[in-house]
Amino acid sequence: MRTKTIGLLSAAVLLLCLLTGCGKTGDRVRVAVITKATNSDFWHGVQSGVEAAASAYAADVTFTGPDSEEDYAAQNALIRQAVEDGADAIVLSAIDRQRNAAAVDEAAARGVKIVSIDSAVDSDAVALFIGTDDRAAGRAAGEAAVAGFVSPAEIRIGLVNIAKETANGAEREQGLRDYLSGVPNAKIIAVEHAENTLADATAAAVRLLREYPQINVLIGFNEWMTLGVGAAIRDADAAARVRAVGFDANVVSVAMLETGEMDALIVQDPYAIGYLGVRYAVALAGGEQAPAQPVHTTVATADRTNMFDKDMQKLLFRF
C-alpha cells in the first residue's frame, strides 16, 4: 500500500511539473538582445536600459553583439544561437537590413517574437521598431549644417557614413538630402563610407578634406564617424573654416563640441532604446499586441548655446 501511495504521489508530481514547468525560472520571459556591437558609448547606453528593464519586468535577458559592426554573419550566428537557447523574444539592431533577414525569419518561424531597435531589418516578421526617427534626425543634421551660414553663401558638404547596407545610416542620409533639396546654395560634394573604428572614420574624413578643399561642412552619421570627423578637423586645424555636425554623445565628442572641433551633435537616447526594446519584447512574448506604429525615441540637436541646458544635459552627460 505504501509503495502504491508513493507511486501515485510521484505521478501527481510529474503531472504538476509538466503543467507548470518545473525547473524553469518561474514565468520569466527569456529575451536575447543582439546589437551591432558592444564597444561604444552608444551600446553601453543601450545596455544600461536593457538591464534596467530586465529588472523592472523580471525577465531573463542576455546582451550580446559581434566584435565588429560590419560582421553580419556573426550576428546571424548569434540570432540562431538565441533560438537554440530558448529565447522567447529577440531584440535586434541589424547590421545589414537584407543579409540579416533570413535569420530573423527563421527565428520567427520557431515562434520567437522579434523587436527591431536602432537599425531595421527587411523582414515582415518584425513586430515592432523602436528607435530614433532617422529621417527626422537626418533633417536635423541638415538644419544644423546650414545654420552657420548666411545665404547665399556656398555650402559644400562632405559626408562620412557607415556601410550602405545599414538601415539607420541610409535613412539619416536620405533625411539630410531631403532637407538640403530645399536649400539651393547647399550641395553634397562627396560621400565616404567607413568601418566603425576611429582609425577608419578619421581616414575617411581626412581624405574628404584633402581631396575636396572646397568642403566647408563635414557630417558624421554615428558615434565613430563623428569622432573621426572631429579628429580630422582637429589635426588639420580646420575648425575655423569647416563646420562639423555629428551624431551621438560621449566624453570625447562632447569635449569637441565645447572646444569647437564639433559645432552640433544630433543626440539620441540609447537608454530608452534598450529599455523599451526589452519592455515590448516581454509584452509581446506574453501575448500582447504590438503598437500599430514604430516607437520613436528622443532626438535633439546640441550645440554650444544649449549644451548646458538642464534637459540637454540629461542626454549629453549620461556617460
Question: Where do the model's predicted regions map?
Answer:
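Short, solvent-exposed amphipathic alpha-helices that sit
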Residues: 42-56, 137-144, 167-186, 200, ...
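Hinge/cleft segment of the Venus flytrap/periplasmic-binding protein
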Residues: 160, 164, 168, 179-180, ...
